[in-house]
Amino acid sequence: MEPDSVIEDKTIELMCSVPRSLWLGCANLVESMCALSCLQSMPSVRCLQISNGTSSVIVSRKRPSEGNYQKEKDLCIKYFDQWSESDQVEFVEHLISRMCHYQHGHINSYLKPMLQRDFITALPEQGLDHIAENILSYLDARSLCAAELVCKEWQRVISEGMLWKKLIERMVRTDPLWKGLSERRGWDQYLFKNRPTDGPPNSFYRSLYPKIIQDIETIESNWRCGRHNLQRIQCRSENSKGVYCLQYDDEKIISGLRDNSIKIWDKTSLECLKVLTGHTGSVLCLQYDERVIVTGSSDSTVRVWDVNTGEVLNTLIHHNEAVLHLRFSNGLMVTCSKDRSIAVWDMASATDITLRRVLVGHRAAVNVVDFDDKYIVSASGDRTIKVWSTSTCEFVRTLNGHKRGIACLQYRDRLVVSGSSDNTIRLWDIECGACLRVLEGHEELVRCIRFDNKRIVSGAYDGKIKVWDLQAALDPRAPASTLCLRTLVEHSGRVFRLQFDEFQIISSSHDDTILIWDFLNVPPSAQNETRSPSRTYTYISR
């Protein structure tokens, strides 16, 4: 005698003949069908017990004849197709929840290829090429190379979308090295323009990219190995020799001299374009923008000049002794003096400059200042660095650590880098006042210092310029012996001031020269000079 509630072959037929609204809520019928389906997939299983919490069903596997099975399956599919999508999903969930692990694996294998769709190929078929291009435009160079090899359609999308051009443009927008290189090498003319019919094809940019990478790697190697092309400007001062300060751009170099003059040089020809006179003492510091040059002198005055005509626009008389350093930006100027004070000025225009506040607290000459929207930072011969609020001009904290007076510093973001007459360079966290690293190597006073995201470049009274690895210096695990990348020796006197970018260092000295250390345009013959990094090519201005 068969067990109670045995489901015969008529189960599926019964399910199909009963309206769906009646059987969907009937657990026994649904569970019976699930059990039957499971048994049909597992020949070794002869019976299966299913419980819904209130009753149990014993299912015997007994597959119908082939003809009946096909008929019943077609009928099930017919009813399934009549349901809404949500009802279909609900029903399939019921089935899957009652299946065994073996069946789940089989279903997963069946669904896997259905879920793997080539949407990049599918989008253009729907007229959505621009979306496919936009998706692939986020790839880096390595991934873009791989994407080109996927299939011809992907290669077509990359080519017609000019994605190599877009990748280069993205790098130029975000990386100063790429931007500067594009201008110096001339390939910026092919960027940021709508593609003309006769413009370079995608293959041009595809081949340009590795050339750019090779150029960048060569520049980095030149920095590390000290390979450079050296240009020299002889300033030919009338009386006292020495170039105390300088600043440059792509077109000109402006220098302040010990002989009280300001000289403007053409950066390409190295010829002197203009000489500005008016100070009665050495020009110790300067800064310029597209409108004005501001200079500080040992005559205790600050002068403002028209950058184009050289006309004196304003003279500020406030400090009692030499003006040693100054900075201006966004309508604010800060000057410091041998008189131990710091002056904060509101700079509405070249002719409208008013004193806002005088900061006192240093016990010796204030040699250098720097600032941003948050802090004013000053360094003094009293061995301290002081931090002040830019908005309120109130004192914030003192950074202590140098053993002797501080001659130079630069401040950016949270980092302060300072150089001292104790012959060391220190890196500081301005927010907590902690000294992060001490760099040793110079043999005399460190007179000037600048840094960017990669390097620190310092100049000292020993006549040497040193290039340091900034990222390694910020890593406490890095050995001290690995921090100095290169020492450059060409000046025959004290190095007073320097500025640098990704491609060059420009420095000035007590030896009355300005040197341009070019790490980009190094002659091919020097590229193989690994043992003579100081090899130079000198051009003397006339």
From Swiss-Prot:
Protein name: F-box/WD repeat-containing protein 11
Domain characteristics, as noted in the entry: The N-terminal D domain mediates homodimerization.
Oligomer and partners: Self-associates. Component of the SCF(FBXW11) complex formed of CUL1, SKP1, RBX1 and a FBXW11 dimer. Interacts with BST2 and USP47. Interacts with TRIM21. Interacts with PER3. Interacts with INAVA. Interacts with REST.
Superkingdom in the source lineage: Eukaryota
InterPro entries assigned to the protein according to its UniProt record, in alphabetical order: Beta-TrCP_D, F-box-like_dom_sf, F-box_dom, G-protein_beta_WD-40_rep, WD-F-box_domain-protein, WD40/YVTN_repeat-like_dom_sf, WD40_repeat_CS, WD40_repeat_dom_sf
Sequence ranges assigned to domain F-box in this UniProt record: 129-167
PANTHER family found in the cross-reference section: F-BOX AND WD REPEAT DOMAIN-CONTAINING 11-B, WD40 REPEAT PF20
Primary residence: cytoplasm
GO biological process: brain morphogenesis; establishment of mitotic spindle orientation; germ cell development; microtubule organizing center organization; nuclear migration; positive regulation of canonical NF-kappaB signal transduction; positive regulation of circadian rhythm; positive regulation of DNA-templated transcription
Pfam family, one: WD40
WD repeat ranges, renumbered to this chain: 238-275, 278-315, 318-355, 361-398, 401-440, 442-478, 490-527
Role of this protein: Substrate recognition component of a SCF (SKP1-CUL1-F-box protein) E3 ubiquitin-protein ligase complex which mediates the ubiquitination and subsequent proteasomal degradation of target proteins. Probably recognizes and binds to phosphorylated target proteins: the interaction with substrates requires the phosphorylation of the two serine residues in the substrates' destruction motif D-S-G-X(2,3,4)-S. SCF(FBXW11) mediates the ubiquitination of phosphorylated CTNNB1 and participates in Wnt signaling regulation.
Biological or metabolic pathway of the protein: Protein modification; protein ubiquitination
GO CC annotations, alphabetized: axon cytoplasm; centrosome; cytoplasmic microtubule; cytosol; kinetochore; microtubule associated complex; neuron projection; neuronal cell body
SMART domains in UniProt: Beta-TrCP_D, FBOX, WD40
Localisation: Cytoplasm; Nucleus
Keywords: Biological rhythms, Cell cycle, Cytoplasm, Disease variant, Host-virus interaction, Nucleus, Repeat, Ubl conjugation pathway, WD repeat, Wnt signaling pathway
Disease field: Neurodevelopmental, jaw, eye, and digital syndrome: An autosomal dominant syndrome characterized by variable features including mild-to-severe developmental delay, speech delay, autistic and/or stereotypical behaviors, ocular anomalies, under- or overdeveloped jaw, and digital anomalies such as brachydactyly, clinodactyly, syndactyly, and contractures.
